[in-house]
Each structure stands twice: as structure tokens, then as C-alpha cells.
Amino acid sequence: MVNKLVSAGKCLYCGSMVTQRSMGTHLKKHLLQQENENPTAQGTVFQVYIRAAEMFLHVLVKGEASFKHLDAFLRKIWMECCGHLSQFYLHGSKVGLTRKFDQVLVPGLKLEYEYDFGSTTLVSLQVMGSYKINQKENVLLLSRNEPLEILCSSCNKNVATAICSVHIYEGEGFYCEACAARHEEECEDFADYASMPVVNSPRMGTCAYMGGAIDTERDGVYVAR
């Protein structure tokens, strides 16, 4: 991802396209409005911002739910490839998956999540706020970055659609369809096993990751609109 990427996502509530930097504040307005419109709500929910460079998720987690629910969600949308182990960390210490959110989370708290202890994918989490809102879902997706405009590292003109997992280092290994065909002639590994799709996840190009199982409409390559 060496070209200048624009990271933005669509708000679940109003459908507006909002930049990564502004999304937390934007969602807060909607959540405060929900809280004010339902003053008798008893449930506690937490707005959590999950980030890996230009890729991000904003989710609303139910206080009664556990870290196991968020782990399952992250696996389905960003991580799962071969059933690797995963772990949440708070100030460097492990957080048990059975711990409930309302036992741990407070506004401003920062955590980390690690998937796969070999070819590791690490993301950061920050609790943006807590609200009195009744919610059925354990984890509700509020926003996710749209697919990033990752350019081919060979021609630097067309959008990349494939990755060579052997050559994916510092600005290399991303190919458009035409350049991927040429790279296949030069790289036996690419034709054999190293060709992988560009997907909207920080796990792309790693291990056997081929894409998520939920929110699949935003899991592909960038399309100009």
C-alpha cells in the first residue's frame, strides 16, 4: 500500500461517506441521539474503533457480551484463514475471551488484538464511548472502510487485483490483471501457490487468507464511483 490511500466508510445510520479521521465523532452524534430518544433504555453498549493502518471498523458491542463474541466477529470479517489462535491484550496483559465487555471496557480504553502467533496480524482497538441503548446484536457493525484504491506496484496505473505472497514487501507484490499475467511468466511460485486476491482486510496476502465471510460487498477491490 504505497500510493496515497483515502480511507473512508459509510455510516450505518445516515449512509453518509465519512473519512476515517472523522467517523468516530460522526457516529457519536447518532448514538447520542438514539440514547436521548430512548431514555428508559437499560442496556449498555460500547462504541469500539478497530484500526489497522488505513483499514478500520467501528462496532457497537453489547455490555453483556464477551470478548469471545468480538473475536468471532473479527475472524469472520477480517482474519479467519486456518483456525489460528488469537488473543486480546490490555496494557500488555492477556484478556480472557470469557470476560464480559462491561467488566473491562470504559471510554478511552485502548487494547490490542492479535490473530495467528506465527504470521501475525495485529490491530488496535479504542473504546470511543458508552451509551444506554438496547441492542439485540452482540456486535453491530457501524462502519467499515470502503475498499482502498491500491495501485499495481508494477505499472502504478491500474488498480491491483492480485498479490504475490512471495514478493509482497515494501511497495511490491501488488498487480493489476495485465501485470499479474506477466508476473506469472517470471515467478513460478505465483503460478503455483503464491497468487492471492486483493481483499479489504489487513490479513490480505498472509497465510491462506482469501477474504471474509460477512459484509462481503465491501470485501473486494476498489471500484471507481
Question: Residue spans of the language-model regions?
Answer:
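Short linear regulatory motifs enriched in tryptophan with gly/pro/ser
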Residues: 1-225
